[in-house]
């Protein structure tokens, strides 16, 4: 699907819901939050004061840092809110994923999450970590500004989630 087709699909599927959105450049690039706000209560991770509220919504939207063709969904998080919301507490979780995040297997998806997505996210957040400054790879730093503090690998939807779905977009989106 294209980004527009994926946005239309989710816009048609989600109506009258409370929706939490984790920090996701992919979702922001699609303008999905703006579409959904027209007929849902959307609590966006990046808007002040919504971090806790987004964790208790009916639906949660986020992306991944790496998606293995063997099925593993990999996310790295600094605060933990985004990864926690993919594991427990929501009726539905949707992972909106650009094709650039695909990797052939678990090891390459994890490598991508650590060495592509995390340095770009650290740069975006203005962190002074080695990966952000050098912009080339993870240094497994111990910086107080480190954004890589939690790692999740999902093989299937956890029992604490009603249902989950990966929406794959045939475009490069996000990090």
Region spans (language model):
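Conserved phosphate- and dinucleotide-binding cores of soluble alpha/beta proteins
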Residues: 55-175
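N-terminal active-site beta-alpha-beta segment that forms phosphate/nucleotide-binding
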Residues: 1-61
